[in-house]
């Protein structure tokens, strides 16, 4: 495996996934070589005047992996531990995810190495605007359309789209997605990824067990994805018995009441504490206990590589639905399938966010809007159809995992586009 940049375990695992998919699909090796490296990598150094008057520089990236299917599309994360190698892996996953969803997008990802919790609101705004200026030459409605990711949100997108609009001298709503409803956004975006995870779980449960009603679920992570996955799983009839974040686990055998998720803006430890108090149960301080609970469905919805070979034997769920990007290592996934546990891969399960971004982009390009109910209906239809296609492919190939079926389906669409263009 030839690379000219610093690698990480996450990037290596992603490349192995792509390589396996190319081989399973019977596609030529030069296709893998075309996907092995991004089309373009931008590294930026962003100056921010801090509240103490000093200038501090923050390193950032924008990785544009492949645009055979259309403009680059992918989020921007602000996190103190981001690396260029991991950003490349995430851009590759976006290429696969966008292809699998049938969207007219290629894959990209952006990042800034910063802990946004340590910035004041003014500092965060200056950093967001600085990043938008730094990447402006490479983005646009038909070039590259960023969105939020870990550590960023709709307010950060609002600052970025405002800064970009200033630079080009016109309102440019379609350049960034997941904006606030007050600034060309759509209210469904707040919960779209978590909603999509719940839809994926429901559709697979329907095919495995006849339905999701009454099935028990545990959700690891109470960020935007996890909190809304828990909420919508309950609304679809599952019994959410446990939720967790880095501070611990809240568990109640007869099921948790997670209705407050829709009403509260609380995040992280505050949300975990609120759920604990509302349900009258204590927080168990070991967050890893979430993986060993006896449940039907486990939703890892926090960060990558949390289900690993050193803890996978403790996983008791029968269905793992990946809300996060890359939460299950390849070795752990093999062990799960050997035990009959099905894993719904990230590029299928958590595509609700980018599908919603596509719907918002279409609205912005045409200066029209759909109401919340119509938007959610369109999102649900696309997610359900994607699950049906991948599940049918997986059923035909008995030796494959569902990830194999998803990756092959995504790669075939990319390959056909590249071949038609004359790139291969």
Swiss-Prot record:
Induction: Is constitutively expressed. Is not regulated allosterically. Optimum temperature is 80 degrees Celsius for oxidative deamination. Retains full activity after incubation for 10 minutes at temperatures up to 105 degrees Celsius. SMART domains: ELFV_dehydrog. Its EC number is 1.4.1.2. GO terms for molecular function: glutamate dehydrogenase (NAD+) activity; NAD+ binding; NADH binding. It catalyses: L-glutamate + NAD(+) + H2O = 2-oxoglutarate + NH4(+) + NADH + H(+). The active site is at residue 109. One of its GO terms (biological process) is glutamate metabolic process. Optimum pH is 10.5 for oxidative deamination, and 9.5 for reductive amination. Retains more than 80% of its activity after incubation for 30 minutes at pH 4.0-10.5. The record marks 149 as: Important for catalysis. It comes from the Archaea. Keywords: NAD, Oxidoreductase. Substrate binds at residues 73, 97, 357. NAD(+) binds at residues 193, 224. PANTHER family: GLUTAMATE DEHYDROGENASE (PTHR11606), GLUTAMATE DEHYDROGENASE 1, MITOCHONDRIAL (PTHR11606:SF13). Homohexamer. Catalyzes the reversible oxidative deamination of L-glutamate to 2-oxoglutarate and ammonia, thereby playing a key role at the intersection of the carbon and nitrogen metabolic pathways. Is strictly specific for NAD(+)/NADH as the acceptor/donor, since it cannot use NADP(+)/NADPH. May function in vivo in the catabolic direction. Also catalyzes at low rates the oxidative deamination of L-norvaline, L-2-aminobutyrate, L-valine and L-isoleucine, and the reductive amination of 2-oxovalerate and 2-oxobutyrate. Belongs to the Glu/Leu/Phe/Val dehydrogenases family. This is NAD(+)-dependent glutamate dehydrogenase. It comes from Pyrobaculum calidifontis (strain DSM 21063 / JCM 11548 / VA1). The lineage of its organism: Archaea, Thermoproteota, Thermoprotei, Thermoproteales, Thermoproteaceae.
């Amino acid at each position: 495996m030839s690379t000219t940049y610093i690698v990480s375990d996450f990037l290596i695992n992603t490349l192995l996934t792509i390589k396996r998919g190319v081989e399973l699909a019977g596609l030529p090796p030069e296709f893998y070589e075309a996907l092995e490296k991004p089309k373009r990598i931008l590294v930026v150094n962003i100056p921010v005047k801090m509240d103490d008057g000093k200038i501090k520089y923050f390193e950032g990236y924008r990785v544009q992996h492949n645009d055979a299917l259309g403009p680059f599309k992918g989020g921007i994360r602000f996190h103190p531990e981001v690396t260029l190698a991991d950003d490349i892996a995430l851009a590759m996953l976006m290429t696969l995810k966008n292809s699998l969803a049938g969207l007219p997008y290629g894959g990209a990802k952006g990042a800034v190495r910063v802990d946004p919790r340590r910035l004041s609101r003014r500092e965060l705004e200056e950093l967001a605007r600085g990043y938008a200026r730094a990447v402006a030459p490479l983005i646009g409605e038909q070039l590259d359309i960023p969105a939020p990711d870990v550590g960023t949100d709709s307010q950060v997108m609002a600052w970025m789209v405002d800064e970009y609009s200033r630079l080009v001298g016109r309102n440019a709503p379609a350049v960034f997605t997941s904006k606030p409803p007050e600034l060309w956004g759509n209210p469904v975006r707040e919960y779209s990824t978590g909603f999509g995870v719940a839809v994926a779980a429901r559709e697979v449960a329907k095919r495995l067990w006849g339905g999701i009603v009454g099935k028990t679920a545990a959700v690891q992570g109470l960020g935007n994805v996890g909190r809304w996955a828990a909420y919508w799983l309950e609304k679809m009839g599952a019994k959410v018995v446990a939720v967790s974040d880095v501070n611990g686990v809240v568990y109640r055998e007869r099921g948790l009441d997670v209705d407050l998720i829709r009403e509260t803006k609380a995040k992280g430890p505050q949300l975990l504490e609120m759920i604990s108090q509302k349900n009258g149960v204590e927080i168990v301080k070991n967050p890893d206990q979430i993986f060993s609970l006896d449940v039907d469905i486990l939703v890892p919805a926090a960060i990558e590589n949390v289900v690993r070979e050193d803890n996978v034997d403790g996983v008791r769920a029968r269905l793992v639905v990946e809300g996060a990007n890359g939460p299950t290592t390849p070795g752990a996934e093999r062990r799960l399938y050997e035990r009959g546990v099905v894993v719904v891969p990230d590029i299928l399960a958590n595509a609700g966010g980018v599908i919603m971004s596509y719907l918002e982009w279409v609205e912005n390009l045409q200066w029209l809007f759909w109401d919340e109910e119509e938007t959610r209906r369109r999102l649900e239809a696309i997610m359900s159809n994607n699950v049906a296609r991948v599940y049918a492919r997986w059923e035909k190939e008995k030796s494959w995992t569902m990830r194999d079926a998803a990756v092959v389906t995504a790669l075939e669409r990319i390959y056909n586009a590249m071949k038609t263009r004359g790139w291969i």
